[in-house]
């Protein structure tokens, strides 16, 4: 045999599969079955229905995923009314939450929210007191040359509004003025189509009343809108930019929007007869700051809104008399502030007595005259002073007011036989407290609101940085300073001389905090105002077009409103909140369908469920 053939045979035998040995001769790494601890065998076959018999069971109870009931008074964000009730029931050992308990805790919940506002006021002021928008609103210090005074342009703007209102009053324009009742309000879809034509709406719709429509036209006349004004732009910068334009009558700013990157809206009001095209060219391109240039547009007012209903208690005889006194005081306050004639209240009352149309109505209440007079007084404050009486909020212009309440208010008839609810009493009490903050600030319990008088606040801060170490050893603890002195009076002199910047900052915080808590409609942290967890998430996200959480969709009240919470949640979230009663046809858009995404007009197929 050749040598090559022999090598191939060896290679073949190397990879050739040999026959397995006998079972008794096979080698195994495991010991034989007879020597093992147990005899291995196949488990018996089980029937189809008993395969759970020999399975091990979970030990112990299943874990619960409910959130713990934390004390709301220890948190810096608001909790919902339902969660507050559950915590209250647990703390007071109430076994079940009944409907009576649900309706009786409005006062307790309102006290909790007032305490929350007081606890978070100082931290909010300290974080925003150095911003321009906050300084313009609350920092009043004559030693620093900061005095809040009304400009001559604004006085002339108010005088023009006053003259227009009085001319209409003398011409009989307000002789039949009356707020719509709840029966007059026509229900419309909450989110109407954008293609809806206002001209096809019913003529008796309160939104299209002559007073409301004329108010809209007056607000948008000779006005341009500048959106997204940054918070670091001060009123002085706007004055320097616009005062040099001869045909600019007045400008106004909206309240700051803490959801939309602290942005504001600016409205520029021009004198009558101004060419708006030329005015737009003159205003556009003006640089207010290094990072902001004016780009104006036509003003906008929200549409498709309902009048906000006022609580029934406002129409009772005693409440109406008290509100009339407050209305007259607010009218006198506006006359003094804007240098207007002080006979407005008397002229309105005389006109209503002599020329008001009195329709025959059997259901007319006994205080019908007082109700109409109070409504006309409130309309005067709304049109001239741009002051919303029912929310105690002051605006800089009429168009700024219409952004929050474009359709005004509606009244409910008071039923003497009906018991006044706790929610209405709370609303009236809060309204009177807001009036006191504006009319009698010296009589307000400022400590309960989270502030102190300016001098007391400064003294408390000085005492907190003066540490007594021995009988004649007092140390300064301002920042990194650690100097020793013989007495506290020497430490105070040292702080006045060496730490003047720190002392000026403390004084600024004290002044701003005092004015901030006395403002009934002050801007607050959204997590303090809103109980929606969605709002807590979007605070750390850039603005992507969310609706303003602070907008008033129902009558503003400090008590709980389930509808208001749902609207806040749906407004702050980009996804619609789920409702169990919602029909399937409205939720169809959330389900995936096998339609052509390139065909936007393709209809959703009808599926047989």
UniProtKB/Swiss-Prot annotation:
Changing residue 316 to P: Decreases cell population growth at high temperature. GO terms for molecular function: lncRNA binding; zinc ion binding. Residues 201-210 have a biased composition (Polar residues). One of its GO terms (cellular component) is MTREC complex. Residues 1-25, 37-57 have a biased composition (Basic and acidic residues). The modification Phosphoserine is found at residues 28, 30. It is found in: Nucleus. Residues 1-60, 187-210 are annotated as: Disordered. It comes from the Eukaryota. It holds the Pfam family ARS2. GO terms for biological process: nuclear polyadenylation-dependent CUT catabolic process; regulatory ncRNA-mediated gene silencing; regulatory ncRNA-mediated heterochromatin formation. A zinc finger (C2H2-type) spans 474-499. Its main location: nucleus. Keywords: Metal-binding, Nucleus, Phosphoprotein, Zinc, Zinc-finger. Residues 27-36 have a biased composition (Low complexity). Interacts with ccr4. Belongs to the ARS2 family. This is NURS complex subunit pir2. It comes from Schizosaccharomyces pombe (strain 972 / ATCC 24843) (Fission yeast). The lineage of its organism: Eukaryota, Fungi, Dikarya, Ascomycota, Taphrinomycotina.
